[in-house]
Amino acid sequence: MDWLFFRNICLLIILMVVMEVNSEFIVEVKEFDIENGTTKWQTVRRQKREWIKFAAACREGEDNSKRNPIAKIRSDCESNQKITYRISGVGIDRPPYGVFTINPRTGEINITSVVDREITPLFLIYCRALNSRGEDLERPLELRVKVMDINDNAPVFSQSVYTASIEENSDANTLVVKLCATDADEENHLNSKIAYKIVSQEPSGAPMFILNRYTGEVCTMSSFLDREQHSMYNLVVRGSDRDGAADGLSSECDCRIKVLDVNDNFPTLEKTSYSASIEENCLSSELIRLQAIDLDEEGTDNWLAQYLILSGNDGNWFDIQTDPQTNEGILKVVKMLDYEQAPNIQLSIGVKNQADFHYSVASQFQMHPTPVRIQVVDVREGPAFHPSTMAFSVREGIKGSSLLNYVLGTYTAIDLDTGNPATDVRYIIGHDAGSWLKIDSRTGEIQFSREFDKKSKYIINGIYTAEILAIDDGSGKTATGTICIEVPDINDYCPNIFPERRTICIDSPSVLISVNEHSYGSPFTFCVVDEPPGIADMWDVRSTNATSAILTAKQVLSPGFYEIPILVKDSYNRACELAQMVQLYACDCDDNHMCLDSGAAGIYTEDITGDTYGPVTEDQAGVSNVGLGPAGIGMMVLGILLLILAPLLLLLCCCKQRQPEGLGTRFAPVPEGGEGVMQSWRIEGAHPEDRDVSNICAPMTASNTQDRMDSSEIYTNTYAAGGTVEGGVSGVELNTGMGTAVGLMAAGAAGASGAARKRSSTMGTLRDYADADINMAFLDSYFSEKAYAYADEDEGRPANDCLLIYDHEGVGSPVGSIGCCSWIVDDLDESCMETLDPKFRTLAEICLNTEIEPFPSHQACIPISTDLPLLGPNYFVNESSGLTPSEVEFQEEMAASEPVVHGDIIVTETYGNADPCVQPTTIIFDPQLAPNVVVTEAVMAPVYDIQGNICVPAELADYNNVIYAERVLASPGVPDMSNSSTTEGCMGPVMSGNILVGPEIQVMQMMSPDLPIGQTVGSTSPMTSRHRVTRYSNIHYTQQ
């Protein structure tokens, strides 16, 4: 049964094949015979979905409707059913529309319009066969219709005008330019084949260019292009299709060719010869102009001339340059001519171009010299230096004072007219940067006028340069010469040999010597200096390495000391100025190379090869032995003892207990201000002289001041940090105040009991002092007297507070008189001039018209009463503190504030007499009065302000404290002077600068009569008032 199944399948396949073969799509194409003018139909069957042949071709630009139908399609299915034929594609349902149509019943395809091949060279028509239901009975077929070309387009050039350039004298067939034209007709067809041709050439004449007919390349016809004849050519070129046939279409273009210049013309001078004249010793920037002629293009290097002096310029006197604007050569005189050497000069001038000549003519060029005659005019000449530069050198070893007046040599000028040394000439030094030279004005001998440093900045590369001027006395002409002085350099690091003394054995007399590590310029060379003569025959030195050498005796030595002079040179052949002495001690040695002589400690040798210690031999290294002498052992023991003793001494100093009280138990360092000690006064002028201090006021020195302010009042403390006290007391306190006095223990006397220590301040000295008791009886007597004096002064002052008339104001003056000036009367008293210092005594005698007797050197002693009653309820509280020097602490320096005072302030001081039997104590301060301060003094005792002498009574000579107080009497309208700034501004010494405040300060407070005992004046005191002191107030200060 299986074979039956396969049989049926095979039959079915055969049936399908038969049906496929019988269904075909037939196309009939009408072909035209153009030559015979006949047409015929050709049937084309589609086999396996492929067309056999194209449809009939159509000619562009013609009416092809007479050829319709151009094709016919037919399907073999039309015998069984009704078929509709349809077409689509370009020219049907795509632009251009409506070119082709089809008969849907018969399948004939017709063309209906004119076609353009340049627009559509080929039409693709898709054909379909449809049944009544619109279904394709056949697969769509493609029908191709080709458009035949006709010559309807002329050639077109890419440019209407072509420009090109070509160098002149170019070889033949050199490409100039390539023309390009295109044709829109069918490619590779006769209608698009273009032929090129040169129609015309301007300028006319022999044709210079050739054109390739097919490529359009324009080339040179020959090598005779000459820019100097024609610099531009204009060609008219035609391009024709159909290979240039007469029936072809054509077009034309212009071709402009520029001929480029090359250096093919030789320059020549306008004249055949030239001449000029010039005075000798003169220069000229334009002696003569030479014109060159060149036919090449102007402004280019082919035209620009280059002038050359071929001969005659042996002394380099002339130079020639080209003017680029005119192409002329300018002959210049750059070096002075000498009539005596060359009265006439014959030059030869040649010319060529800046650019190289063209290869076509380069071999033909020859430079032809043109003669130029120069005549030198003789003139009267001055001196001149020959040679213009002369070298001198300083001999080795000349330095320091030996340079002074050292003669370098002689440099003289000559007379150019005669050639002999110049006469009537003065020599002077011109440029001399260091002012080191001097010259003899007549002989020209040059010397050093001063010493100089050989490392000066004026010495460059070891040469010092200066100029010498020679001036002719007659004509005034000047000649300049240059001298170059070679100054030998100082070798700061000249090679030095280690200076130690060396020991050598007599049986092996050799020792190693080395250069120290600070020397530079290795390797070094060593040699023995034969001084004294014959020593070089006894010793030989030979280098072992870059820094060492071995010194060997040539003969047997005797025990003793030897000094051998050795000269060491570095790699630059520089050496020390003097030979170095190598000290040797020769002795007999044992087997260990130890010196048997007890005077030598041992032998110090060094291994030549391994840098070790050992016997010095040339072949091997030995063992070094170093001995230590008794002196060395003693120094070692002494050092150990000092190391042990130093901590013990330090421990004793640190553990010593401090004595609580008493001057005798304190450590008092010896003062440095005693005799024999130099003091630095830090002042200008001569040093102070040693004179009697009893009648000489010590000079004022700068001192340190500091203004301290608390929250309630302003205090001014004046510290006499620069003062010096001499006498029997050990402390002096300066107290200035009004109601309250604040002071400082300022100085200490050198003769007081107890110890004192000197301390240095900014300027001068400041001493600490020991505390001691104050003589209260003396204080009572002192202040009682001052109180009486102030009371008498107030009672005796007349009341002059009334209208006063002054003559110098004139009559009817609108300005009123000044009242309330009764206190000025005392200032007008001329008796104050009798108490002026000796330096003002002469002025006072002139004013008083009398002779003033000097004050006696001693004052009368005033007995001190110990039981004087107190006058009035005055209470004085003295607070003092004394500290040991170990407690001294210093504060940082503080800037002193300027005093400011408001209004007019009256200050009055009363001084009491002191015991004349005691030498006055001199205190040196440096007061500085505030601006706008008027100070007048009515002195009751010879105490001139606190700069002067303070006389201390004899019974107080051994006391530690002496109080010096100033007091102001209060009156209505007078502001409270407890303000310490006022005190500083108008009375008392004002110290400028800063002070180091230490523990030696003591404060003295003076109480008001209304205050109870023990109450101090402070911020809560009813007698204390606060004032701001202005700097522009007028302050009148009176002392009594």
Swiss-Prot record:
Cytoplasmic side: 653-1040
This protein's GO CC annotations: cornified envelope; desmosome; plasma membrane
Signal peptide: 1-23
Subcellular location, principal: membrane
Matching SMART domains: CA (SM00112)
UniProt keyword Membrane present: yes
Extracellular compartment segments: 50-631
Keyword Transmembrane: yes
Annotated InterPro entries: Cadherin-domain_protein, Cadherin-like_dom, Cadherin-like_sf, Cadherin_CS, Cadherin_Y-type_LIR, Catenin-bd_sf, Desmosomal_cadherin
UniProt GO BP: BMP signaling pathway; cell-cell adhesion; hair follicle development; homophilic cell adhesion via plasma membrane adhesion molecules; keratinocyte differentiation
Chain segments annotated as transmembrane: 632-652
Highest taxon, organism lineage: Eukaryota
Topology within the bilayer: Single-pass type I membrane protein
Tissue: In scalp follicles, present in the inner root sheath (IRS) and all layers of the matrix and precortex (at protein level). Expressed in the brain, muscle, kidney, pancreas, spleen, thymus and weakly expressed in the lung, liver, heart and placenta. Highly expressed in skin, testis and prostate; less in salivary gland.
Residue ranges the record assigns to the propeptide: 24-49
Desmoglein repeat repeats: 884-909, 910-940
Occurrences of domain Cadherin (ranges): 50-157, 158-269, 270-385, 386-497
Glycosylation sites: 110, 545
UniProt KW keywords: Calcium, Cell adhesion, Cell junction, Cell membrane, Cleavage on pair of basic residues, Disease variant, Glycoprotein, Hypotrichosis, Membrane, Metal-binding, Repeat, Signal, Transmembrane, Transmembrane helix
Self-association and partners: Interacts with JUP.
Entry's free-text remark on domains: Three calcium ions are usually bound at the interface of each cadherin domain and rigidify the connections, imparting a strong curvature to the full-length ectodomain.
Matches recorded under PANTHER family: DESMOGLEIN FAMILY MEMBER, DESMOGLEIN-4
Record function comment: A component of desmosome cell-cell junctions which are required for positive regulation of cellular adhesion. Coordinates the transition from proliferation to differentiation in hair follicle keratinocytes. Plays a role in moderating lymphocyte migration to inflamed skin and maintaining homeostasis of the epidermal inflammatory response.
Protein name: Desmoglein-4
Source species: Homo sapiens
